[in-house]
Structures are given as structure tokens and as C-alpha cells.
């Protein structure tokens, strides 16, 4: 599939949206993907302080993309390629970027000063930030619990050269913070200690759930997400026309809603990476929301395809007869 890079025309700048709590269900449920109706310092140099949007995988300048992909710049390649394999065109429109959280500089020193029974990681970005601090702290021996397979993949390369010092030892039966907190194994005969490096905007399910079970939990807000500072208006118009918006975090949902706040008629389909994002999308008023039972790339693509199918059915009156 041909790759098209559109020239950047006028730029739309916008301020961060008002914060809103993140974290489902609805009157319409399907078995595979459940539709739910109803300027900080960058963490790494690869994140620029002023981000503009770019497009990918749109076959021609006059084509309407089928899906908008919205993860931060540099992290959309996997989903774009997976969609291409299924013949689905996409438009890359990064809505958020990661920035340092208030506890970013403390993480390495905490790892140096104290050992923990568990390190709990609930997102790929939290994993990447942790690995940087872990290396700075001279790579102490740690046992990792992750929320799902996508997060676990962040540690694969590091574990190959860690000589057993870094070990992913736990994944819950369902990829949510509540289930992780209810299933994390305890140390026999002692109070288990947990280090939880998290996003500033992450909810409290893990801390509350583990604390109720008697775990000692240290939470460090090591990173946060902020909206990109500018969006190309040409790309935004293309995005508004796309049948499906794909989102991977509640922050991306909020950024999109702030960006389109003057587009009262927008009611297209939303494909979320998992239940937490879908719950946030529903609470924020979006309809036609789809998500996979198990978060991850494969399930996300299936949800996108299901959303595209639902859009096609809604656009074809004869299909409903």
C-alpha cells in the first residue's frame, strides 16, 4: 500500500482539555469486541516540545482513510502495519505525548535504596520509563508484575541481557488494574512490598486493591500524558471523515473530544485498545464504542474491523432489512 505524506498546511493549536476521571458497559454487547453504546518537559529527546500531526497509509490525496490512529508519535507503526495486512487504510494523527511526571527523578534512587517484592507495571510507557531508571540504578534484581501481554513485551529485550536480574513473573487473568490487584501473589509469612511506577493520570484501583489486601505500596508518578500542541487542520478534516477512530488511552479520548468540541455532528465509531479506555470513552459521551476482551494488538485490530463492519452496515440501509 502506498505511503502518502501530506504537506503541512495551516496548523490548529489547542490547549490541554479539562481533566476527567478515566478508567463500561452498555445495552449492546457482542462476544468478541464489546460495543459500548450510550507544556511539560519530554521524557526522552525523541519527543519534541511542539508536535504536529502526520499521515500514513492513505492511498491517495483524495482518499478518506478508514481508521485514524492516535498514539503518540513513533508508536503507531505496529497498528498501521497490522491494518495494512488486512487491507485497511489509516491516517496517523498523534493526539498525545508523554512527559516527565513529578516523581521521575526519584525512581532510580528508590530502586537503589530499597528492594521490593514486586514492581507493578501497567502500561508500555511505564515499562520504558522504569527500565531507564533500573539501568541507572545499576540493574538491581527485581520481580515484575504486568497488566497484560502488550506491557510484558517492553521487557523482552532487557530480560535477554539481564542475567536473571529482571523477571516478569505475573500477569493477571484479565488485563485490568482491579483484577491485577486482586490476584497478585503475596509473600508467605511477611507483608509484601510493591513499587508502582505509574502515570500521573492513572486511577487508584491498584493502590486501593493491594492496600486492602495488606500490601505495602509505594506509588511514584513517573510520567504523564499531555495533548499535542498543534494539529494540522487538513489532517484533522480527514480524520473527521474517517469511519473509525482508534484510541489507546483515556487521555487520547479526552484530547480528541477537546479537539472536536465545535464538531457537534461527529458520531463515528471508536475502537479502543481495552476496557479501561472504552469505559472512559463511554463516560465522556462517545457512542458506538468497541473494544476487545483481551487488550493487545490482535484484539485491537479485530475491534477496529468490527467497528468498520458496523459502520458499513449503518451506511447501507439494505443490509438492515
Swiss-Prot record:
Ranges annotated as spanning the membrane: none
Reactions accelerated catalytically: hydroxymethylbilane = uroporphyrinogen III + H2O
GO cellular component terms, semicolon-separated: chloroplast; peroxisome
The organism's place on the tree of life at top rank: Eukaryota
Involved pathway(s): Porphyrin-containing compound metabolism; protoporphyrin-IX biosynthesis; coproporphyrinogen-III from 5-aminolevulinate: step 3/4; Porphyrin-containing compound metabolism; chlorophyll biosynthesis
Annotated organelle transit peptide span: 1-81
E.C. number(s) listed in UniProt: 4.2.1.75
Pfam families linked: HEM4 (PF02602)
Keywords assigned: Chlorophyll biosynthesis, Chloroplast, Lyase, Plastid, Porphyrin biosynthesis, Transit peptide
Residues of the signal peptide: none
BP GO terms, sorted: chlorophyll biosynthetic process; protoporphyrinogen IX biosynthetic process; uroporphyrinogen III biosynthetic process
Subcellular location: Plastid, Chloroplast
GO terms, molecular function: uroporphyrinogen-III synthase activity
PANTHER family found in the cross-reference section: UROPORPHYRINOGEN-III SYNTHASE, CHLOROPLASTIC
Family statement: Belongs to the uroporphyrinogen-III synthase family.
Function, in words: Catalyzes cyclization of the linear tetrapyrrole, hydroxymethylbilane, to the macrocyclic uroporphyrinogen III, a precursor of tetrapyrroles such as chlorophyll, heme and phycobilins.
Name of the protein: Uroporphyrinogen-III synthase, chloroplastic
Upper classification of the organism: Eukaryota, Viridiplantae, Streptophyta, Embryophyta, Tracheophyta
Amino acid at each position: 500500500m502506498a505511503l502518502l505524506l501530506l504537506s503541512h498546511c495551516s496548523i490548529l493549536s489547542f490547549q490541554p482539555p479539562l481533566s476527567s476521571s478515566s478508567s463500561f458497559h452498555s445495552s449492546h454487547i457482542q462476544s468478541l469486541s464489546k460495543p459500548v453504546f450510550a507544556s511539560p518537559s519530554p521524557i526522552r529527546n525523541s519527543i519534541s516540545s511542539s508536535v504536529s500531526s502526520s499521515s500514513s497509509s492513505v492511498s491517495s490525496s483524495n482518499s478518506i482513510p478508514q481508521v485514524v490512529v492516535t498514539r503518540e508519535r513513533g508508536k503507531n507503526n505496529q497498528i498501521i502495519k497490522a491494518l495494512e495486512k488486512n487491507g485497511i487504510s489509516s491516517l496517523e494523527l498523534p493526539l498525545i505525548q508523554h512527559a516527565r511526571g513529578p516523581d521521575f527523578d526519584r525512581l532510580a534512587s528508590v530502586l537503589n535504596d530499597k528492594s521490593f517484592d514486586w514492581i507493578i507495571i501497567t502500561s508500555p510507557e511505564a515499562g520504558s520509563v522504569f527500565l531507564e531508571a533500573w539501568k541507572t540504578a545499576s540493574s538491581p534484581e527485581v520481580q515484575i508484575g504486568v497488566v497484560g501481554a502488550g506491557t510484558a513485551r517492553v521487557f523482552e529485550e532487557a530480560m535477554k541481557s539481564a542475567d536473571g536480574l529482571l523477571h516478569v513473573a505475573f500477569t493477571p487473568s484479565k488485563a485490568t488494574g482491579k483484577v491485577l490487584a486482586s490476584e497478585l501473589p503475596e509473600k508467605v509469612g511477611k507483608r509484601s512490598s510493591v513499587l508502582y511506577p505509574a502515570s500521573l493520570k492513572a486511577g487508584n484501583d491498584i493502590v486501593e486493591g493491594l492496600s486492602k489486601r495488606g500490601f505495602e505500596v509505594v506509588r511514584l508518578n513517573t510520567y504523564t500524558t499531555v495533548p499535542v500542541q498543534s494539529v494540522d487542520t487538513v489532517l484533522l478534516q480527514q480524520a473527521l471523515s474517517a469511519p473509525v477512530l482508534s484510541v489507546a488511552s483515556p487521555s487520547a479520548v479526552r484530547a480528541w473530544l477537546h479537539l472536536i468540541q465545535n464538531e457537534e455532528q461527529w458520531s463515528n465509531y471508536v475502537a479502543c485498545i481495552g476496557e479501561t479506555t472504552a469505559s472512559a470513552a463511554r463516560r465522556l459521551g462517545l457512542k458506538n464504542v468497541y473494544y476487545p476482551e483481551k487488550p493487545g494488538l490482535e484484539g485491537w485490530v479485530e475491534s477496529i474491523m468490527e467497528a468498520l463492519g458496523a459502520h458499513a452496515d449503518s451506511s447501507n440501509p439494505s443490509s438492515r432489512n
